[in-house]
UniProtKB/Swiss-Prot annotation:
Keyword line: Antiviral defense, ATP-binding, Nucleotide-binding
Subunit note: Homohexamer, forms a 1:1:6 CdnC:Cap7:Cap6 complex.
Example GO BP: defense response to virus
Gene name tied to this protein: cap6
A GO molecular function held by the record: ATP binding
Residues that hold ATP according to the record: G80, T81, G82, K83, T84, A85, R204, R205
Recorded coiled-coil stretches: none
PROSITE patterns membership: AAA
Keyword ATP-binding: yes
Keyword Protein biosynthesis: no
Protein name per the record: CD-NTase-associated protein 6
Cited function: Regulates complex assembly in a CBASS antivirus system. CBASS (cyclic oligonucleotide-based antiphage signaling system) provides immunity against bacteriophage. The CD-NTase protein synthesizes cyclic nucleotides in response to infection; these serve as specific second messenger signals. The signals activate a diverse range of effectors, leading to bacterial cell death and thus abortive phage infection. A type III CBASS system. Expression of this CBASS system (Cap18-Cap6-Cap7-CdnC-CapW-Cap17) in a susceptible E.coli (strain MG1655) confers resistance to bacteriophage P1.
Organism for this UniProt entry: Escherichia coli (strain KTE188)
Alphabetical list of PANTHER family matching this protein: 26S PROTEASOME REGULATORY SUBUNIT
Assigned protein family: Belongs to the AAA ATPase family.
Amino acid sequence: MSKSSVFDSVIDLPQRELTERENILLGFESRYESVHNQLNLLLNQGQLLDWSKKYHKSVLPLCKLVAEQYPLVIFHGDVGTGKTATAECIANRIVRESRTEDSALFKLSNRVRGSGKVGEMGTLLTQAWAEVCEAAGKNRRAILIIDEGDSIAASRSQNHSHHEDKVAVNTLIQGVDELRKFGGRVVVILCTNRLSVLDPALRRRAAIVEEFTRPGLTERESLFRMDLGGMGLSDSQYRQLALATGEKEHLPAWTYSDIRTRLYPAAMSRAFPERALSFNDLMELLKIMRPSPVMGDI
C-alpha cells in the first residue's frame, strides 16, 4: 500500500471550505463551545508553564498532570449525527483562531484494515502514525481523524476479537501514548458509532469524550428552516416536517444525514426539471421513507 492510500485525505489547515461548512452544521457553535476550552488546553500544553508563572507566580503541580493528558478526543453517537463533519470543522476552527498556519489534517482510511494478511493491519497503522509524526516535525501541528473507530479499536477482550484486531488496538494505544511527546501539537479525534465496544484502555486515555445524538424536534425544525429557506413555507409547515421526521412507533427519529442525503434528493428528483419543489413533495415521501436504523449504543 502506497503512502497516500493510508489516508483518505491530507489537507493543510485552515481551509475556507471547512470554515463555510460550519454555517450548515446545525448546532456547531454550541458544540464548539462545549469542547473548545478543553481542546485548546490539550493543543497548547507547551504554554502551561508560562501561564502558571504569569498568573500564579510559580509552576502549579497540576500543570504537569494536565500536560500528561493523552492527545485523544472521542466523538461517539448514532450514525448520521455529524461526528466526522464536526471533527473536521472543529479542527479547522481551532487552527484558524490560533493563527497557526502550518497545520495539517489527516483522515485515516479504512483501508488500514488491510486485506487480511498476517501483520498487515498493525504495519499499516504504524505507517500512518509515522507519517503523521513526520508531518508534525519540530514545529507543525497535525490533527488525525479516525472515522468508524470501532472497526480498528474494538475491545481486545471480545470473544470474536482476532489476533490481528488485538495487534491493531495495541498499535493504536501505543501510537496515542507516543504522541504525548509532541506536547499537544498532534491530536487524534476518533469517531465511533459505538463507544461501548472501544477497548477500555483506549477509552481511559481520552481527554475529551463528546456524545452526538439524533436531532430533537426543535433541532429538526431549525434544520428545515435553514435548508428550505426560499420555498415560502409557513411556520405550520416547518413544524409538520419536524413532527413527521420524529420518533414514532418502532421507528427512531431521522438523522441529519437522513434528511439531507436521502429526503432532499428524493424530493428534488420529483420536481426537477419541470416544476418547483413543494411542501407536498417532502410530506409524501415522509409517508413511505424510513429513517436509518439505530447504530449507536442503546
